[in-house]
Amino acid sequence: MRVLLIHSDYIEYEVKDKALKNPEPISEDMKRGRMEEVLVAFISVEKVDEKNPEEVSLKAIEEISKVAEQVKAENVFVYPFAHLSSELAKPSVAMDILNRVYQGLKERGFNVGKAPFGYYKAFKISCKGHPLAELSRTIVPEEARVEEVPEALRKEEEELVSYWYILTPEGELIEVDKFDFTGYENLRKFVNYEIAKNRIAEKEPPHVKLMLEHELVDYEPGSDPGNLRYYPKGRLIKSLLEQYVTEKVIEYGAMEVETPIMYDFEHPALEKYLNRFPARQYIVLSGDKRYFLRFAACFGQFMIKKDAIISYRNLPLRMYELTRYSFRREKRGELSGLRRLRAFTMPDMHTLAKDIEQAKEEFKKQFKLSMEVLEGVGLTPEDYEVAIRFTEDFWKEHKDFIVELVKLIGKPVLIEMWKQRFFYFILKFEFNFVDNLDKAAALSTVQIDVENAERFGITYYDENGEEKYPLILHCSPSGAIERVMYAILEKQAKLMNEGKKPMFPLWLSPIQVRVIPVSEEYLDYALYVAGKLEGAKIRVDVDDEDERLNKKIRRAEKEWIPYIVVVGAREKENGTITVRRREDGKQYETRIEELIKEIKEKTEGFPYKPRPLPLLLSKRPKFRG
């Protein structure tokens, strides 16, 4: 079943003609109708719903009721609408399910109207236009599900209701449909994405074209979808990001470890943990035993901590692994370039804290660490939106702490609040990048976990020598490395749309300087300049192609080279270079040593790796036709 929910000022319809040979019998007064201040449910009943009409009806009633509660609508209008699906159920089944939904909503106390089934109808509707006003839901009967989720868990999840707010740095908590989004358009887009929960990629995001054009990353037809290949320039960027985040986390105080990529389905602690997640694992068979490929570093780090002897003096205890790879079998329609993959590289730190106060202190520090890490890759708070999620009880007890976090970011954030705890954590934040298609992807995240220490048997000895269960903070200060690359490319696509020059952060640029001789006569001097730069650990190449100077410059511009160095007779005679700086468009003549000094100052504190391709352009293969 597909459901489109529109919170409306009114809806009115008029029957025009029969659409089916045997439509629903109706009286004269059913040929037209109107309802005001209403949640309209446009519904397509699908072929798969024939497997279990009762279950689909109950789930639809539940979903529609939840949304009606969120938008505070007392009136609900059920509108048969075949155009949400191409796989429709038999008319008799569809009519039965729609009537079940209609009656079920009435039994829940709503004032319910409906349009007749099987007719062509004209209708008018006035959508209210707030963030909750347009939502969609897909409901699938259990027999049709590919994934298996435990019945008790599914029931709990279905009953979980999210309450959405905007929290300002001044501490004002505002219901999301009452917040004035003027000046916060990106936040509005993020809110709409979060509440609608539509993860399907309808079209290709701009970063995909850029990753292919720049020969960074490509699809691998010989592998499972969502597993990518990286060309030399893309591997360099990814490798530098991995090194950068790892250095930041170790500098923060984490101990780096390495753990297996596969785990036993039947391990008691892992079995319980898996029940908290949808069954989207890759399965590996070894003899007659089944293993799953990890979707995070939690398992391995928890097993190490379970076996360790830990004192209260060791807390907070931070452990880190860069997982290459973590695996998650995302739905095919949700896979999208670098944004959502089935194999991804995740920097994953877990911190043990003795109590909630120490956990809050660490949470705040890791919030700041995440901001710092993203700033280093060229993403400021203006580039991402923040979501903070917690229970109502946590808000009541720790409101001032939450407001402190919002003050750090300096702008309004989205709040998701629950009446009771369903997940293993009591507090979570994410920094979310909203791309050019208005899709959001979580980057940095931290959670306070209150379940898994006991589940895995992780303990520490307190001041009195008694064993206690610590709290666990899950932290990825950047999010998946592939997602960071996605965010960088999507940001550059936005700049291009605004008529600005795109470029990678200087320390991440595969080639930082391109030296172009004005003719073959000056190739030796170009190589001399390149040698000086390379000796200073600057990634440099030389365009030795037999082409006109303007074409070479255009090629370097198209590749987003930060510094284009042109050398000819004057430069060779004076021992200088002429530089075009992409960042500000400035062109100037200088000495090699001065350019080295400028680049080293701008890349100080960031990791370095050598040039990923041959020095001379004429020696390079093309990876894409």
UniProtKB/Swiss-Prot annotation:
Main location: cytoplasm
Cofactor note: Binds 1 zinc ion per subunit.
Record-linked InterPro entries: aa-tRNA-synt_IIb (IPR002314), aa-tRNA-synth_II (IPR006195), aa-tRNA-synth_II/BPL/LPL (IPR045864), Anticodon-bd (IPR004154), Anticodon-bd_dom_sf (IPR036621), DTD-like_sf (IPR023509), Thr-tRNA-ligase_IIa (IPR002320), Threonyl-tRNA_syn_edit_dom_arc (IPR015011)
Consequence when changing residue 121 to M: Isolated domain has nearly wild-type deacylation of mischarged L-seryl-tRNA(Thr). Later shown not to deacylate L-seryl-tRNA(Thr), no activity on L-threonyl-tRNA(Thr)
Chemical reaction(s) catalysed: tRNA(Thr) + L-threonine + ATP = L-threonyl-tRNA(Thr) + AMP + diphosphate + H(+)
Record's subcellular location: Cytoplasm
UniProt-annotated stretches for the region Catalytic: 206-505
UniProt source species: Pyrococcus abyssi (strain GE5 / Orsay)
Free-text comment about domains: The N-terminal domain (about residues 1-143) is an archaea-specific tRNA-editing domain that has a highly similar structure to Dtd (D-aminoacyl-tRNA deacylase); the domain binds L-serine and L-cysteine and most D-amino acids but not L-threonine. Editing of incorrectly charged L-seryl-tRNA(Thr) by this domain is tRNA catalyzed.
Keywords, sorted A to Z: Aminoacyl-tRNA synthetase, ATP-binding, Cytoplasm, Ligase, Metal-binding, Nucleotide-binding, Protein biosynthesis, RNA-binding, tRNA-binding, Zinc
Record-listed Zn(2+) binding positions: 298, 350, 474
Stretches for region Editing domain: 1-143
Needed cofactors: Zn(2+)
Gene Ontology CC, one term: cytoplasm
One GO process term, biological-process aspect: threonyl-tRNA aminoacylation
Protein name per the record: Threonine--tRNA ligase
Protein family per UniProt: Belongs to the class-II aminoacyl-tRNA synthetase family.
Subunit structure: Homodimer.
UniProt cross-references to Pfam families, sorted A to Z: HGTP_anticodon, tRNA-synt_2b, tRNA-Thr_ED
Function: Catalyzes the attachment of threonine to tRNA(Thr) in a two-step reaction: L-threonine is first activated by ATP to form Thr-AMP and then transferred to the acceptor end of tRNA(Thr). Edits incorrectly charged L-seryl-tRNA(Thr) via its editing domain. Deacylates correctly charged glycyl-tRNA(Gly), but neither glycyl-tRNA(Gly)(2'-dA76) (the terminal 2'-OH of tRNA(Thr) adenine 76 has been replaced by hydrogen) nor the 2'-fluoro tRNA derivative do so, strongly suggesting the editing function is tRNA catalyzed.
